[in-house]
Amino acid sequence: MTVQRLVAAAVLVALVSLILNNVAAFTSNWVCQTLEDGRRRSVGLWRSCWLVDRTRGGPSPGARAGQVDAHDCEALGWGSEAAGFQESRGTVKLQFDMMRACNLVATAALTAGQLTFLLGLVGLPLLSPDAPCWEEAMAAAFQLASFVLVIGLVTFYRIGPYTNLSWSCYLNIGACLLATLAAAMLIWNILHKREDCMAPRVIVISRSLTARFRRGLDNDYVESPC
């Protein structure tokens, strides 16, 4: 059985979502923070970097001699206090921890959906394109990714006065929308197939059967493809 174009398109959309999700995770441009002394820095899920103060025409005040202040970065992890510097540390720490967890779960779900598609192409009995659970498994994986990304992004609905959302956050919003689109395409395809199969079988009886005293005639019938 050849893979339908709609299924292949949904998997391709989910692959783009997976790429955008990883790009957003490993860049340091999730939010931009401004400190009281005028310095600015960009904070990501796993690292933060100081930014050059171009308005002053020189290096940032916190730069030390012999170091490039444009990318003076530090790694972040679970429960990092640095992400909440200048803001309510408890709130910001919870926001980033929640987003890290949701990002990892979404990456795992999108990857599982891609592997399910590839294993179906190989021809495994349980995950073959002929199996009814093949598309359902991919749709469930993509929908899970969309759901957890929404949960993580909602935590950034309220941010402090010194913090602004940056382009990595909007990139992750795009990944969430693409994952939702991929799941919706598969769900629509599944429901469309079921509607076709729920139609009653069409049986056309030959007119010759109505003739009297004639035997041995076979039924001429046409059944639905399901």
From Swiss-Prot:
Gene: TMEM204
Role: Can influence paracellular permeability. Appears to be involved in cell-cell interactions through adherens.
Organism: Homo sapiens (Human)
Chain segments annotated as transmembrane: 6-26, 104-124, 137-157, 171-191
Taxonomy, superkingdom: Eukaryota
InterPro entries per UniProt: TMEM204 (IPR038992)
UniProt-annotated location(s): Cell junction, Adherens junction; Cell membrane
Predominant location category: other
Membrane topology: Multi-pass membrane protein
Tissue spec: Highly expressed in lung, heart, kidney and placenta. Lower expression in thymus, spleen, liver, testis and ovary. Expressed in endothelial and restricted epithelial cell populations.
GO annotation terms (biological process): lymph vessel development; regulation of vascular endothelial growth factor receptor signaling pathway; smooth muscle cell differentiation
Induction entry: By hypoxia.
A single GO cellular-component term on record: adherens junction
Keywords recorded for this protein, A-Z: Cell junction, Cell membrane, Glycoprotein, Membrane, Stress response, Transmembrane, Transmembrane helix
Official protein name in the record: Transmembrane protein 204
Residues with glycosylation annotation: N164
Cytoplasmic compartment residues: 1-5, 125-136, 192-226
Segments in the Extracellular topological domain: 27-103, 158-170
